[in-house]
Amino acid sequence: MKNQKLLIFNVHFMPNSFGGATIVAENMARYLQRDHNWDIVVVTTIKDPKIVPYGIVRYQSAGISIIAINAPQSLSYVEFYKHDKMSTIIRNLIQNIEPDVAHVHSIQTMGAGILDELSCAGVPVAVTVHDCWWICERQFMINKDNRYCFQAKIDRNVCQHCVDDFVRADLRLDYLRDALLKADMLLFPSEFHKQLFVQNDFPVHKCHVNKNGILPPRVGYKKTEVKDSSHKVRFGFTGGPGPIKGLDIIVKAFSGIDSADYELVLVDAAQNIQVSWHMGLNVDVKGTLTVRPAYTQETMDGFFSQIDVLLFPSQWKESFGLTVREALIRDVWVISTDVGGPAEDCVDTENSALIPLTSDAAFLTSAIEACMDKDWKSYKNPYKKALQTVASQAEELSDYLTRLANKVEH
């Protein structure tokens, strides 16, 4: 039986990997092709000043055929979501590739015209809605004050106070809504994120949860022992600078703790895109502060084996929280805000401590203090078998895509 052909779209792709959505897109492409007999072609973008704008580069990575369109160095406001020149190129690619089904991930700069082209070509489409780009100009529902806006049912009268030009933002929202409604299936990384879009009148029969999968630890993975007894508990944070991921609250929380018997490990994740944020870092804690280089999917075992507790005091309702699951499956305790996707696999007091979404650091301080006297050497997460792995996500996704390709009711 001939393999079915799957066309995948994502703004970034290996070797130019960036962001959680890209990790998911790459993992799914690899596993769908390797384990589920899909013939896969990926369409992505690059930004290479040595190549003419809109030039096409074809290459292979991890055995996957990739077509990269060279995006211009600068784009207009409209081109970030409605990119007509990209759409023309993609129309020709669709005609040449003749896919059985398409899977759309994050397509900022590529433009939602992709969905028009696929619809016109009669190609069934699944869209994984990784974030709020489709319903929020600022993509993550974080307002001008750098705080979560807390809307559930989007009221554009509220949005007008958050954008620079409401008329153009309104046109953008109309266009993206109409485009997303052309998809045959909408996939979401969490029940929370699915319900957000259902509340905003996207058809419930099209909406399904396909939780992001994580790579389990390698065989033989185990925690490293603390060599210096003065660093009794090791706390890790991967979110970077700024208030929205919670670093400010972490600093405040530790300032209220008298003990210096801990290590705070910060990951300079920006190094994965050849920049760094730690040079201007101003973190003053009584314990030992360590800044470590960014880790990759291949090296994350090393990072998680050297921390006991992951700090995830995010100040917005994230759609999933990949880092939380990567920690949970490696027997790392998690302190997380009790909102959105990150909390869905956390069981308070059993594999995590859930705290309110608030700028008051007292809740985080209490959760940190509760970790100080625990013996983390023997801790095991009793719920880690329930976590979605990359393999199980790919199996579930393959079933969804097969149903679409074969035009089976879903």
Q: Each predicted region: which residue ranges?
A:
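A short, active-site helix/loop in glycosyltransferases that binds the activated sugar's phosphate group
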Residues: 163-206
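Nucleotide-activated donor-binding/catalytic signature segment of Leloir-type glycosyltransferases, i.e.
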Residues: 276-298, 302
